[in-house]
Each structure stands twice: as structure tokens, then as C-alpha cells.
Amino acid sequence: MAFELPKLDYSYNALEPNIDAKTMEIHHSKHHSGYTSKLNSAILGTDLQGKSIEALLRDLDMSNKAVRNNGGGYYNHSLFWKVISPANKGELSVELKNAINDAFGTFDGFRSTFSKAAATQFGSGWAWLCVKNGGELEVCSTANQDNPLMPGIGCGGVPILGIDVWEHAYYLNYQNRRPDYINAFFNVVNWSEVSKRYGALK
């Protein structure tokens, strides 16, 4: 079965003023849609067809740039839309809060580490909060549409939170002020969803 562009759980203007409606529309209906169609074309008629996106990325031949770029773009954006919401939704679960404190000292320590990873990612890419095999948390960043599920990336684990720092994610509203966009991102994080994803990996 072909991959499909996921529908959003909210309207394009629902994240304003933190993320503007025009950016959301272009980001979802153009960029994510493009990754979806190009991924389907790249796997058509191959043994990759029919795999879940997670299995496809975990077993990826990293030299296959079409699947690497478009499969990464498909997965990354599908996660991104789920971990943001119109209002800063819910609170951290006790389990996730304790894990954050164990890994980063405090929530503010986590936020500072995550924000630095996002702000200092050179060029296009993503910053992630990942759950490693032992259950501990790690913050890392990846270039372009790479993500921690891919082999040999250097920040292994399952991402439960990600921020897109490609310019198309923020430039209409924030221009070159990436740190302002990162701060605004924290106003729309869906902590209930992030906590649920963490709990599922425990």
C-alpha cells in the first residue's frame, strides 16, 4: 500500500501566532506532500514496497538517496505534526518528567539542550529528543531529512519529539531568527502526545 499524506488534527491557522497559517499550508500541502509522492515513486516495484516507514528507515541502504531523503522527510513530518498542537496541550507524564530530570537535571536543562541542538544545526535539519534502547533520553540533531532511526546516524534511538529547522518551517514568519522560532515551538508542543510515545517505549 502506498504511503499517504497524513491529515492534520487541526487547521492551518490553529498554531498562530507561533506558527503562521501560510507556513503551515505550504509546509504540509507542498513540502510534506512532495516527500510522500517521491517516496512512493522511489519504492515502487522494489522489495521496500509494503514495509512500514519505520522498518524501511531502520533497514535503509544509506546510499539510496531517493528513499533516504524522501522517506526521512515523510517520517519526520508525520511525527512533527503529531507532537505540536493548537495549545500547549497537557503536561508531562510523571514517567517522562522523571526521565528528563535524570538525563538533563531539570526541564529547563532539557529545554536549553534541545534548543541549542536546534539552533546550532548547520543548514537544514532537525533536532530530536530520543529514547535509547535502555530507556534513557538523548538530545541530538541530524542534517537534512536524516533521523535517528536510520543506521549510522550517530544518535540512535526512537524520536518522541522533533523540531524542523529547515528554513521552510519558519522563514515566512521569523526570517533568520531561528532561536525565536524555537522558543515559539515550545508554546505548541503537545506534551500529552510526547508522553504517550515515551510510555509506549518503556
Where are these regions (language model features)?
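Feature for soluble, non-membrane regions of globular proteins
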Residues: 1-202
